[in-house]
Amino acid sequence: MSEKPVVIVTGASCGLGAAVARWLAKSGAAVTLVARSEEKLLEIAADVGRLGGSSLVVKADVSDFHACRTAVETTRDHFGRIDSLVNNAGIVQPLAPIADTDPDDWRHSIEVNLFGSFYLIRAAISDLRRHKGRIVNVSSGAATMALESASAYCTGKAALNHFTRVLAAEEKGLTALTVRPGVVDTGMQAVLRNEADNALPAEQIAYYRQLKERGELEPPEVPARAIAWLALYAPREFSGKFLDYDDPRISRPALEVFGETLV
């Protein structure tokens, strides 16, 4: 059995999830990397090893409960325990007004952004109870906003926040929370800037493009450091909360534990 904390991170092949895995590796944690692209996961696994952590690569689609259960079972078999989950996998599509949205696309968004977290938690709940585990569900400011042409994304994230409140009420031995990672320089932002011309209002697209041009997008490493800290150290009083990544109660101790840079 691993003597280090074992954390499952979904959406770990790029962007925020990959950065979370790297920070966890710097602390020496064992990380199960979950995403749909095995090739990209293997690249992140190499980074994890260089930074002092150990990893397990599991190719899986979080919208499939059986795939999530396999990820949990494989982690348990490999490391002997599961201490934390970081449910980061998410998609911003479909981007269209409600009247024009394909029902199958809308359903798929909810399956990834909401059901994916439920599936992994459901599969891992016994292991997490055993180790008084932590669950960090990555949400969004969109959970509290009405963004035109992003109804599925907004709905999924809002539901994720309330699901996490219920989870925290039911599982008093666990620490379960949602976190807003801010506006991060990831592939999701690239989609909003470059692939939404016929979907989003023009002023909304202009706003996203200005964020990039002005250098106002947060590097993934900054919110990822906060999320990694929460996965390892989130106190019980955070359970059920929707927290900002730059909340001083998180960002300050995260900086103290991990330092300013990954290397």
Residue ranges: model-predicted function:
Residues 38-39, 59-70, 103:
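The beta1-alpha1 cofactor-binding region of Rossmann-like NAD(H)/NADP(H)-dependent oxidoreductases
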Residues 121, 156:
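Active-site helix of classical SDR
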Residues 96-98, 105-107:
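Substrate-binding pocket helix/loop in short-chain dehydrogenase/reductase
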Residues 13-14:
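Conserved glycine-rich cofactor-binding loop
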Residues 140:
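Residue(s) in the substrate-gating loop at a strand-loop-helix junction
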Residues 29-44:
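Conserved glycine-rich Rossmann-like NAD(P)H-binding loop of the short-chain dehydrogenase/reductase
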Residues 178-181, 186, 197-253, 258:
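C-terminal helical subdomain
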